[in-house]
Every structure is written in C-alpha cells, then in structure tokens.
Amino acid sequence: MKLIFKYSTLLTIGMLIFVSCKSTKDVIAEPVKDLNGRWRIVMVTRNTVDITQYVDSAGFRLTLGDDNTYTLENNNIPFLVNSNGSWSADDPQYPYNLSFTPNDSTTTFTGKIGTPVIKGVRNLEVTFSPGCAANSYVYMFEKIQ
C-alpha cells in the first residue's frame, strides 16, 4: 500500500511539473530603419579600396526629410544625383535600395544600401556606380546629431 501511495505521489508531482511549464517564445520585431536626418560621409571606398583620404567630402551633407525630400550640400564628389529632389526606400524595416528622383528630372537613380550599427549608432551605407559599371563606390554615412 505504501508503495502504491509513493508511486502515485511521484506521478502526481511529475504531472504537475510537466503541465505547469509553459514555453513562450518572444517575438522580436525588426525595427523600422529611421533614415530621416542629416548625414555626413565618414568613409569612401572605390572598388573595395579605402579612398577616404583622397576625397574631399568634409562639407558634403545629405539630408533625408520626413516628407521624402532630400537636399545635398557641397556636392562636389561623385554621387547618385547632383541636385535636390525626392527619395524613397524599398522597405521601411528591411531597406535594400534607396532611390533618388531629382526635381529637374523624371529619372530615378537607385543605390543599394545597408544600415549597419557601429559603436551603437545606426549608419547608412550607400553603394552605387556613377556612369562606369567598372567603378563601384561605397559611401558610409554617419547621422549628424
């Protein structure tokens, strides 16, 4: 009798432990990438070679507005566009392309983008080829606070 009581007690405790444990999975949603703001170039590569020291990009500024307009300041270096206009990203959470349409044109120019986090700050990486497909530029932008 004691043996049956002992086994039934162990079985009851085991069942209580089994049914009391619930596994829940936290769903982590990818945040929307905030591309709006004023950006400055911190690194330039051409065909995977760092040419930052040879490019005068100190005054270059790219401002992406909340209203999907962009402005360029001191644009004296190769870039996708040469004048102000409107911009769009292909996906707010997982953007892979950034498109620019100058005000004085109906043509849209698109560059591939990445949004790496460096030192806890989201950066903007734009890859494009201005005219010559043999040359590929990568501009790493840092948001100006």
Residue ranges and their predicted role:
Residues 85-88:
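Short beta-strand-centered aromatic/proline hotspots
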